[in-house]
């Protein structure tokens, strides 16, 4: 089954080296006020993360509004994706990018437009060899598997786990296969804040473990609460998980992304803003609009 196209899959259902600075420890030099981590919300789950002079592009979906059919057997599948246009051109999005991280190859994280826009020799990290082989077959020549951790441009990136849906969903083989695997990533550099990008996962023990092990000061959650037809649970996080993250990492800033851009997201930014205000955690949670940048 070709994991590049989630719509088809759902219709069926219903390298790595560590530098001395990082060796042997997850405890790094305390953040320096002059060392800023920059995060730009591009659209959907696509974000740019910069540690100093090193910039990563995460999960690029760069197509024009309405390019693809809605994901079949999901919430609002009659709508075409993406729901909105980018705030800047794909050329502007990829400008200054040093490496790409594809947490998994579902269409809303790795699409044809991204494949067309990106240089074929750009360093690109995937979660496993299956995804790496797919992306190599698309013409990319510098694809690396993030089996555990790696160092790139002075930044340590570490793979974390999760599950892209509920146990009920994964008990159905025809659904478990297309949902597949998806990774999260922890970013660390001496003197900079640690950032944990959870990826397409629901709240699992792996999320707790990542927070306990790495003590992130910034946590990026895919919080659009994507829903499938016929199932109660979501396939990514939602508002209650944003609250849970704020409780699990009491000193961290929470950034909510993967919202308002593809059909099966059931939680809007406005609804999440109302929720976090009701919970009294609005000062802890950033919900950036497309194109907006944050500095940590």
Predicted segments, located by residue:
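Active-site environment of divalent metal-dependent phosphoester hydrolases
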Residues: 64-65, 105-110, 132-134, 150-151, ...
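Cap/insert and terminal regions of metallo-dependent hydrolase folds
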Residues: 201-290
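Pre-active-site segment of Zn-dependent metallo-hydrolases
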Residues: 29-31, 54-101, 112-115, 167-171, ...
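Active-site neighborhood of phospho(di)ester-bond hydrolases with catalytic His/Asp-centered motifs
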Residues: 58-59, 96-105, 125-128, 195-201, ...
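Active-site HxH/HxHxD metal-binding segment of metal-dependent hydrolases
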Residues: 67-70, 87-149, 161-166
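Gram-negative bacterial Sec-dependent N-terminal signal peptides
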Residues: 1-22
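Active-site-proximal loop/helix segment associated with metal-binding centers of metalloenzymes
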Residues: 65-71, 77, 159-192
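Beta-strand-turn-beta hairpins that frame and shape the catalytic cleft
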Residues: 31-37, 50-56, 149-158, 188-195, ...
